[in-house]
């Protein structure tokens, strides 16, 4: 089924509700995607792009229901990737002599995928035009490396529609085609996810290319993307967002992600986050266990953040494999204007944190001091983690911090209540872990200064995860 975009322009693409992986398995398309193809019917009939190769037969059959294939005068391929040009082989088998307009680099890519050098290719460059009748022209604009060397955009005069290729798109499937018809929160989340994970490496090219396009002084009433919605309501809003995202974007946000074998590094991550929040309550802090989180959501949060803390246990003297893989991906994304710090726990020997610090620096992050803990962090080690978080908050602050009274309050409470008043320390009879009322157990929201009698009944030993009934009064303090 086709959808009228504007006047004689129809959407003839394909929705893909089920797709969950893109670029292999590197991009999770949690809300599906669409492959947008457009049919322009003027004195000349023009098809702009096709769809993903897995929908080739369905696409050609649907297109045949819209138009006699022999009446298609021109095919424009803005991008040679298989989710754009995948149905070319099926289509060209029916109309083998139809001219294909694309960049020189696209010919190499198309032949590399379809192996038909005999097709009627016509090379276009920025500023070239194609007359399609009724006083309208197509104007071509090369956009190399946004995000492939062959990429270009196509502008239709008269209707003032920019067929923008991958730019301004999103992997987002909905029965509605236009931006003003869909859930706005979902839409802009997917726009930012798309930019963060696909276009970030090319941010330095985004601003000059947008400036070049605006320099043509052409009105833009609609932006018709290759994936997701068509921008008809205030289409320049997404252009303005791209200019913002391309300018070394950051929010007052810190992302923490880690991998852990025995929860030791997780304990460090939680304590660091507590220290950050104590010192700068205005900053947004997001924590992810990489083994249980959507990788693309982590990368989107890194893109949004002013800094990232990455944690890893040591395994065979190196970092955990999932951490190594994601840091390698961050290297390729070439984030700018961001700070980083490495942390992690180890046993008899370390090595992972130092290695991780080097990799983060190589990825272009401005490095802050790293933090290491041996074995499971005790209360003193967790306090060091909290202090590390406090120092990170101070170093990474984007504005003067509010004066904190946390330390003053703790000191006053400690001096007002003696250890003796809090009762005896308690020892786990299974693993020998000791509960000290003066220190509490912040990981379970048991505040310093909490007597054992006031510890909640659902308390679990941090070492062996058994309940309160296995605890006994420490022998040295028994009367």
UniProtKB/Swiss-Prot annotation:
Binding site for Fe cation 2: 83, 166, 227
Sites where the protein binds Fe cation 1: 79, 81, 147, 166
Keywords carried by this UniProt record: Cytoplasm, Electron transport, Flavoprotein, FMN, Iron, Metal-binding, Oxidoreductase, Transport
GO CC terms: cytoplasm
GO terms assigned for molecular function: electron transfer activity; FMN binding; iron ion binding; nitric oxide reductase activity
NCBIfam families named among the record's database cross-references: PRK05452.1 (NF003954)
Protein name: Anaerobic nitric oxide reductase flavorubredoxin
Species of the source: Shigella dysenteriae serotype 1 (strain Sd197)
Lineage of origin: Bacteria, Pseudomonadati, Pseudomonadota, Gammaproteobacteria, Enterobacterales
